Amino acid sequence: TTSGVSGITSSTGLPSGVTASYSANTLTISGTPTATGTFNYTINLTGCSDDATGTITVFAPPGGISSNLKLWLKADAGTSSTSDAADVNTWTDQSTNSYSASGYSAGGKYYENGINFNPTITFDGANDYYTISGGIIGSGVNIDDAFVYYVGTFDTDNTQMAVFHESCSDAANGGENSYWKFQREADAEIFYNKGRANSSYSLVRDDWGGASSQPYLWTAVAASSTSTPQGTNKYITRNDNLILANNGTSNAEGNGGDFHIGANNTGGHDFDGNISELIIYEGVSSASDEDKIQSYLALKYGISMGTTSSTFSYLSSDGTTIWTGNATFQNNIAGIGRDDNSGLHQKQSKSVNYGAILTISTQAIAADNDANTTSLDDGEFLMWGNNNASTSSYADLPTGGGYTGRLQKEWLIDMTGTVADVHVEFDLSDLHLNLAGDEASDFYLLTDADGDFTSGATATVATSFSSNKVTFDDFNFSDGQYFTLATKQSAPGGIASGLHLWYNASTQSHNTGTTQATDGQDVDNWHDQSGNNFDANSNQGDASWDEDG
């Protein structure tokens, strides 16, 4: 409140979407910011010799959900170094609490392209954890509800590895030893405890069901009521698939113990893997809010949520459905898109699932998402998922147009807004098919309105074919469109019609896995080149490969 001022002469430094006004001796700054960051403003008041100055900090929270955000560590912000493979000595919380996590010794290492072209912090399991001194609960404060969202990997089997740990007390039970912790156990269980140590009231744990080094989105919940998205006090999900849910509550009162990331309170249970993002809310998330937070993380990191039997619809921060759960195509979901209210701008994506062959980008694929200099508009999304058909299966197509067949695997597009002129790339390295195509003109992107492709499909010839990668530049998809890759199928004498089985000693006769056998090596499996998947595997003893025949 001021006096003797008649109005505002000028203002500078306010974030876009925020304005200053003066009326009835009161200066008001208001609006909805459309940009994030720290803004130092100056307002010159008419009739006053002193300017009004101040600082406004605007941040875009995960999924647009800022209420009760307790901790937000992400590898693409707040790290003391952004040089590839460099030590990260400090990691700063992106919530308004601005906790600073200090690395023990050198801390973890920063990698620019960790998960789906986004950065990650890598821990080697040897005392490279972080500490927030004094913890984040607050001494003498009870944390009733704690919702944890974590994206990363566990890279070692049969080892206890803590994502985070803070010692606390159970004041209601005489200060009994308690802790707050999320980790993977040595017996391949996932473990979340908030309260009394290993009590059924505070603990939820079960077989984790995952694979080492595979990125997942974990959600771990311990709440004082059952008004949670799962209807229970406690639960853990992996990629929205329920691991375990149960009831029971326990007090977790802060006692000034440090909060550790990548180890327990004594430095044990060292973490070996990657942490790309760790988010904690102190409060109960609604089902809609949880979906928004998970959708933000899943799109950013190329994580496929749900299953064909339990589908998941991805939401933007304003509640718009950007991927509608699909009982056929809820596999290997990925997407590009921009959501300013989440601080999300994903410009190139590939599913992190094993065997994914498709990448889509706003331009030729860059080294990482940050290096991609193009831009989408806020609210634009292009999502895709596939039917989970084998990449070793081939479907015949009517002759003509330079191709004889297509992959059995096909994809579905779900578009919000208009995302145009995208770069589409198929990596054929893992295909167990003997394709005859050896130049761009041999490959076609087939699009279709119904996913049948036998009639009414549109074929677009590839832009390039190099290093086993087929690319299509400046391609425009339509919402609800199906697509797949078509080419010539190699066949004996060029006759593919009616081909039922074809073993060729010179192609895909493997000693182990997908490694081509060399002279004198045993052949463990021999892949059928017909596209019908009649692969032959050794049951007892092995035939050997002779390069001279």
Language model: regions and residue ranges:
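Extracellular/luminal low-complexity segments enriched in Ser/Thr/Pro
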Residues: 28-36
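Low-complexity "stalk/linker" and mucin-like segments enriched in Ser/Thr/Pro/Ala/Gly
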Residues: 7-26, 454
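A short beta-strand micro-motif common to beta-rich folds, especially ectodomain repeats
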Residues: 37-48
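Extracellular/lumenal carbohydrate-interaction signature centered on repeated Trp-anchored short motifs
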Residues: 64-69, 134-148, 205-216, 252-253, ...
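C-terminal edge beta-strand
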Residues: 49-60
